[in-house]
Amino acid sequence: MRHSRRVALVVSTLLISCFASSCGLLVRSRTILRHGKPVVQGQSPKLLSATKTQLNARITNLYNPISSFQATVDMTPSLGSVYKGQIKEIKDVRAFVLYRKSADIRIIGQTPVVRTRAFDMVSNGIVFQLFVSSRNLFVQGDNSAPATSKNALENLRPDAFLSSMLIRPAGPDETLVLMDDTDEEKAEYALLFLKKGPTGEDVASRKIVFDRLDLSIARQIVFDAEGGIISDTRYAKWTVFDNNSFPAHIDINRPEDGYGVAMDVMQMQMNKTFADKDFLLERPEGSQLQIIGANGSDAKPASPPPP
């Protein structure tokens, strides 16, 4: 036994010496990328470390100070998804986003060039209303109502924007799990939010990705009960607006609904005071009404208003 150990030690020593001197082998340095750029040898940026509690606190510190905002954004809606093999973008849409805690949101989109109203949608966190000017169509229903239109843009929901634009910290029903996802091409933390499934098992409800170079939030993925992706949102150009940090570029993709929206913030006013009427969307006279049933029921067909 002692002889075997001595032999193993000698072999290990020889192997280490061989590799240390290259032993005639071809040695290649692997390129390390950070933000898509090669790292210069000896100048590797320092990676920041944090616990799951500290990362959740960062989310809280971003979320809590914002009670409202009014933003002007350049919006690029897109139809399709990577799962469908095709994505078509609609360029140069200007939009105005109004938000008030806890869940009031209104988004008014303007057509390219002429800047007439393309759509107007509002939600109080429970129900939503959407007016599509090109079709003179007024849609209303629960936030949880299914996407039923063959026109993906008619399936826009204000709540989908809100859940992506404002990143919530962990709720009382969520458990946190932290993973270090650092390799040659990226340096990230992945913070998983777990909820209890119907049979008591842990189910991932969302994942938030942090850049380890500065611990900024780079991405948020929200999952359905089966693990499918409801939304995949990427964040960039974090900017301070009125002493509050907010991403100036937000790229929302909703593969199950078949659409996405990229937004670039042009102007932002934080913690603005709104009146209730600012979140009131009245049905235009002569528009067709489509009511999407509650609890997943089918949408009622569009109908004209009574005379």
PLM regions and their residue ranges:
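Extended lipid/amphipathic-ligand handling interfaces
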Residues: 57-59, 94-99, 121, 233-240
